[in-house]
């Protein structure tokens, strides 16, 4: 009969299982890693890495960019305070000599033109004023017209003024004469022979009592 040896139960341990093989492989990996040489690792900044790459790739060495770049700021100018009361346009005119000379020339022309016009119209205006003052005063029509050859003065408002005033007024401008001395409506006056028989004398005895006389006159 076959008898088992005494240590037969130990035969199971002689054969290793798969689990044991995996554990054995895991233990052998760190041993291999320890045997390899360690690689040197450098920790650098991103900007330093960029500059390093540029230096290595560029044909010429480039300067390193500044780290602190100043930020853009809006600089506003100070408000302008005008010390004088003259506006800017007037100050610019005063500073420009050409403009100031031209303005002085224009002002002198205006003064000369105003002075010449005043001298021309001063004398006619004085005559006109004196004539109007003379007309405003009441005068006797019998004194203004002197009697000549026994003729009586005509009772008309046309001869209220003196002959000297009429000649002086005729020297004025034509436009003023039209307003100062209005012409009569009709240049002819009709007088009855009965009313003017004593005035004209015995020369009109040959004219009948029913006939009329017409007299025309002109003003020079």
From Swiss-Prot:
Main location: nucleus
InterPro entries: VQ_5/9/14 (IPR039612)
Subcellular localization: Nucleus
Gene Ontology CC annotations of this record: nucleus
Motif VQ, residue numbers: 49-57
Role noted for this protein: May function as negative regulator of plant defense.
Additional detail: Plants over-expressing VQ5 display enhanced disease symptoms after infection by the necrotrophic fungal pathogen B.cinerea.
Name of the protein described by the UniProt record: VQ motif-containing protein 5
Protein species of origin: Arabidopsis thaliana
Organismal lineage: Eukaryota, Viridiplantae, Streptophyta, Embryophyta, Tracheophyta
